[in-house]
């Protein structure tokens, strides 16, 4: 009897070993590469803590990608700085080489171009998509198709996009679509064989007959802000979303090549909210990207042996600290913020214009209660109320001190409101810029076991290329 039991155990062990080998031996046909711009370790942990706090408990409520079975953490320094910018980090994630801050797709000599994993995928016969929640010519997406010594060369980067021969692009718009004496980037895009669609509904109408797609937000949305899609916390019903972009990309790339595709998806405004030190908005952006990852995860479940999903970040933004006093967190307070900091600034400007000299402190207090929970769900100190009142007086007197960050400008009242909420929730910040913190790497699917331990950001595209069979 003992002999039979031992034999059975050995057979089970052998079967498990063979199954594990089979699971790791597959070559992925479908590669998803998600990049959360500015999404460091604490942005992920903080979001999960926030989700649990909203349910009234201590702990975490996992994001789907944080439960992926294979994980690593990556260094992010550039060739020129201990703290990278998005151009150098995007280039490292795209082509596996370090370069200097501000550089897109070139070696540190600022001359030698380096092809990206998207190009390697295209040359291997895969359909290719590059997408983002910010502009299509911004640093991270540009790193996959452009070669420019300065990330601010937006018109030239747009020209590189047109000549890339990739199948699908998506983002808010072009930042600089026009140049005197030259064709607009819209015209150049169409001349290169792309069908421009505005919004998800128009994509659904026109995609079937299109050879290549450039998916942008509606013209009305771009008139309001062409630089990015609205923050998730500010989103209105008809706004284009990262989930819609991901769904459209999968649909179109499968149409182009049912057997093989590569898709990069960037959650670009995690970083922007980090520059603003706006925790509520950061966490809602991370949740928004997680929802896009869920779309890819649904695809993976239908093709588990043929799909690889990588989720990582280019750098951490803000030096987010999860705790600023004693051992207590009050992340549940963050749910009472209803707008991003810049959106609330615009909202206050409209109120000032509406009421003029008749704007009272009581009106402002009621608005702060409605949009931040102050004096109701969120208790604030006498000193904090005095700070807010002083900002109100400054607005009335026309001496408001506006605050400016990398991507935003807002009045002092909105700045103080989000700062007080962050402080009371027990969130700290060390910077209004990037930091040198490790970034997480999560992986699931064919070849995902190659993601483990401490790696560098330049290792990630090399690992993907190796397991997917792309020639570098």
Can you name each region flagged by the protein language model?
Residues 1-23:
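Bacterial Sec-dependent N-terminal signal peptides
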Residues 3, 15-16, 93, 122, ...:
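Solvent-exposed, well-ordered amphipathic alpha-helical segments
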Residues 12-18, 71, 75-76, 99:
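N-terminal processing/targeting junctions
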Residues 28-46, 93-94, 98-100, 105-122, ...:
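Mobile, glycine-rich extracellular loop/lid and propeptide segments
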Residues 29-30, 39-45, 49-91, 138-472:
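A post-motif C-terminal structural segment
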């Amino acid at each position: 009897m003992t002999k039979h039991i031992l034999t059975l155990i050995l057979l089970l062990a052998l079967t498990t070993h063979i199954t594990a080998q089979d699971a790791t031996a597959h070559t992925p046909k479908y590669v998803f590469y998600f990049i959360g711009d500015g999404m460091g370790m604490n942005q992920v942990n903080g979001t999960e803590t926030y989700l649990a706090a909203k349910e009234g408990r201590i702990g975490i409520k996992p994001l789907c990608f944080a439960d992926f079975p294979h994980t690593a953490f990556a260094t992010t320094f550039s060739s020129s700085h201990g703290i990278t910018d998005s151009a150098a980090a995007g280039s490292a994630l795209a082509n596996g080489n370090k370069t200097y801050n501000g550089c897109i797709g070139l070696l540190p000599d600022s001359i030698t171009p380096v092809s990206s994993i998207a190009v390697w995928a295209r040359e291997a016969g895969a359909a290719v998509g590059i997408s983002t929640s910010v502009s299509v010519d911004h640093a991270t997406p540009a790193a996959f198709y452009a070669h420019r010594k300065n990330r601010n060369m937006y018109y030239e980067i747009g020209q590189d996009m047109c000549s890339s021969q990739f199948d699908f692009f998506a983002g808010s718009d072009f930042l600089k679509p026009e140049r005197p004496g030259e064709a607009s980037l819209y015209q150049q895009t169409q001349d290169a064989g792309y069908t421009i669609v505005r919004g998800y509904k128009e994509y659904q109408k026109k995609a079937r007959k299109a050879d290549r797609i450039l998916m942008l937000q509606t013209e009305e949305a771009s008139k309001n802000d062409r630089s990015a899609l609205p923050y998730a916390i500010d989103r209105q019903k008809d706004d284009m979303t990262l989930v819609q972009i991901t769904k459209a990309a999968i649909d179109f790339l499968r149409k182009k090549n049912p057997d093989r595709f590569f898709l990069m998806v960037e959650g670009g405004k995690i970083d922007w909210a980090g520059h603003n030190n706006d925790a509520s908005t950061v966490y809602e952006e991370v949740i928004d990207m997680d929802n896009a990852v869920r779309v890819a995860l649904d695809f993976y479940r239908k093709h588990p042996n043929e799909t690889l999903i990588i989720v990582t970040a280019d750098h951490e933004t803000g030096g987010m600290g999860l705790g600023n006093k004693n051992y207590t967190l009050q992340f549940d307070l963050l749910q009472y913020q209803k707008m991003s900091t810049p959106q609330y600034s615009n909202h206050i400007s409209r109120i000032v214009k509406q009421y003029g000299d008749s704007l009272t402190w009581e009106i402002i207090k009621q608005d702060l209660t409605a949009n931040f929970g102050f004096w109701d769900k969120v208790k604030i100190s006498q000193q904090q109320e005095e700070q807010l009142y002083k900002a109100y007086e400054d607005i009335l007197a026309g001496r408001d001190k506006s605050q400016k960050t990398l991507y935003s400008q807002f009045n002092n009242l909105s700045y103080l409101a989000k700062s007080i909420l962050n402080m009371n929730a027990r969130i700290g910040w060390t910077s209004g810029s990037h930091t040198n913190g490790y970034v997480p790497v999560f992986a699931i699917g064919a070849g995902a076991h190659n993601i483990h331990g401490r790696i560098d950001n330049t290792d990630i595209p090399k690992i993907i290329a190796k397991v997917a069979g792309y020639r570098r």
